[in-house]
Amino acid sequence: MLCVLLLAACSGKKSGSEAYVKVLPDNSLAIVKMDLGKFLDESEILGNTFIKGAAGKGIGSLPENMRPLLQNIYDNPAASGININAPMYLAVANVDPVSMVITMDMDNMEAFENALLTFGMGEIEVIEQDGMKHIVTGEDEVACAYDSDKLIVVVDDRYADIATYTELAGDDMAVNDKRFEKLFEGDDDQAAVYDLGAFGKELVRSGEVEPEFEPYIKMLKGCVMYSAANFEKGYACQNVYVDMPEESREALDKLMKKPTRRHFGYIPANSFAVFNCNLDLTSADKLLESADVKEMLEENGITEDTAKEILKALSGEYTAASWVDGDDVENIQGMVVVDCNDRLVFDMLVSIVNSECDATIVDSDVYALNVNKREQYNYYTYEYETVTKGSDYYLMYKNGVIMLLPENLYNEICATGELKPLADNIKKNRQFDSMGNLMVDFKPARDAALVYMRNDSSSDVKVLFEVLDMLKSFTLDFNLYSYESRLNVNDDSVNSLKYLTDKIISIVVQNGGF
């Protein structure tokens, strides 16, 4: 019953000045805002034919005295008594033991109480205490209370006490804390604020973090992360930003720079996923002062000076890509390209590779990894023989870059012995013009699934194709303290949430749901 009323707690654009948000403590590790009403409005899920049919069956199965009320709440969620123009908030005060509070804005206490008692079928007891009406749960770990301003649910592994949150002083309220200001004033569909420093401190205190990682967790002191998600026409997006001391931000800006895409000429045009970033690892040499890092270097026979040379050599562009080889959807290939201005690092890498596999020299600074070869026992000859399946991978060092790539791509890029851009490279795929650090183009994957369906018409493959058919592309643009992701769908004429909701419900129905 309470779940029904929670779902009816819907959206709005209110600020954080209402009484119901004053129960959120400022020492919260995290506060999440859930705009369920906006979800209902944008998805139009309650108007979906299949959902209405399923809801009708569910309501029809209830006792007769409940049906009119629940149907009324389904048709008009405001009839639940909860303010449909205000978001619901969840604050986490502790992780071990768990302690959290959920609060919603009360619009009509009489309507809420009527719904509560009707669905409770005489089994719910309500008592008045300290100016609020308390729902008797029979559990020490869960408490629920309401008045004309708010509905509060408290969950605490030790003892759930409503008064802990209703008697907060002004300075102890999150609504008066600048860390949470954007959360209360913003109009995002869904949003959350995480105090990373407090989270880290709590994890250390509870013993969830191994001692050797404590110094890194302590580096989060003063860092607060804000996350927001929104659904727009044609796409859904999420933005995350970590507010941190200026000194820390400047250090991270030095470590990660804007990518130049200088390796894109080597990436096949039919790639469905490409990753690209630009790192200046010399700015991370302070990590070498860590006792744990020093111990790791000593175990591998690497001096601190050599480690600094490695960081310097590997500073630059990093690019990786994946694609389907022809029509063989089970043969997904990939490549990695890394800037390296010192062949010493390549020699070290070759040494590591040789310890793991039987690499052979193909050309100067080119090694075949022989990953497509394996020993197989021949029952006719009673001997083991080498069997080759699929494409081998090559590891090479040329023109200041290290490349790991399939044999067939190597033959095209290095046909003359020197690096040569592909005639059909990713720059010709306009989808990737808008990419930041990562992009996934779902069309090649969708085409591959379509080919696969010719040989396998099982429901699982059909579902995979239907899911891929909803999506156009995914992009991710990030640095070390913020990122923006965007999921583009194949219809930009409607809100992406409605589009995805309708499609997913349709897939469920086709596979026997509802």
What label would you give each PLM region?
Residues 10-138, 174-225, 234-333, 344-358, ...:
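Structural boundary/hinge residues at secondary-structure and domain interfaces
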